[in-house]
């Protein structure tokens, strides 16, 4: 009850104050307050997923309307090719998928999880459809074309999100894309990270050859 009546709305208010929800419009420009951060999309997605979990337990028209408003913002500002990232679209559009350390795939994964949870809780599939378009774009850029500047995420998350997307939709290629991301780890050159060694992101060896826990533990989990 505390989560439903207090926590979810306190976080909502804080995200409004800090500009996280406004950032979904992808219209920030230099000189404006509340410059988006590279992982803000994941913050918003986690809130949306939490709201979905609450809605699954008990309907709440006010909470559902708040999520729907955010979904509409995403729909209005998603790129035609399916890409959606508030930081890169507004701040560095030319740098899309060029820096492994900047959490694009991590943010995408949290958005996928939120979309699955919301569809499961409410039966509404608009958000899910938007994120399936994004997943399809990621599959094309990373697996089919291999045109991104990196091939595996700097921060794991999208792998488990793609499994959830597969379980909900039955679309096996999402499972195969998850497998592809996992099995590509440790198979590419050192020095692809600007700030961290490959061990930091569990990319120093193929997954099945790793015998010790290394790097940033949240990524490893």
State what each model feature region is.
Residues 1-221:
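Glycan-recognition and catalytic cores of secretory/periplasmic carbohydrate-active enzymes
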């Amino acid at each position: 009850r505390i989560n439903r009546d207090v926590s979810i709305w306190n976080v909502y208010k804080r995200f409004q104050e800090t500009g996280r929800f406004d950032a979904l419009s992808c219209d920030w420009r230099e000189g404006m307050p509340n410059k988006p951060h590279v992982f803000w999309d994941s913050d918003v997605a986690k809130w949306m997923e939490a709201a979905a979990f609450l809605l699954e337990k008990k309907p709440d028209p006010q909470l559902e309307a708040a999520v729907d408003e955010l979904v509409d913002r995403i729909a209005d500002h998603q790129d035609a090719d399916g890409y959606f990232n508030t930081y890169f679209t507004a701040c560095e559009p030319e740098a899309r998928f060029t820096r492994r350390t900047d959490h694009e795939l991590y943010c995408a994964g949290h958005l996928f999880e939120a979309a699955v949870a919301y569809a499961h809780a409410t039966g509404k599939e608009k958000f899910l459809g938007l994120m399936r378009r994004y997943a399809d774009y990621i599959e094309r850029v990373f697996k089919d074309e291999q045109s991104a500047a990196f091939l595996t995420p700097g921060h794991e998350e999208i792998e488990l999100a793609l499994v959830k997307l597969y379980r909900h939709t039955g679309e096996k290629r999402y499972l195969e894309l998850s497998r592809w991301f996992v099995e590509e780890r440790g198979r590419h050159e050192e020095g692809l990270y600007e700030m961290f060694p490959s061990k930091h992101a569990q990319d120093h060896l193929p997954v099945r050859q790793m015998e010790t826990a290394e790097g940033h533990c949240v990524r490893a989990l």
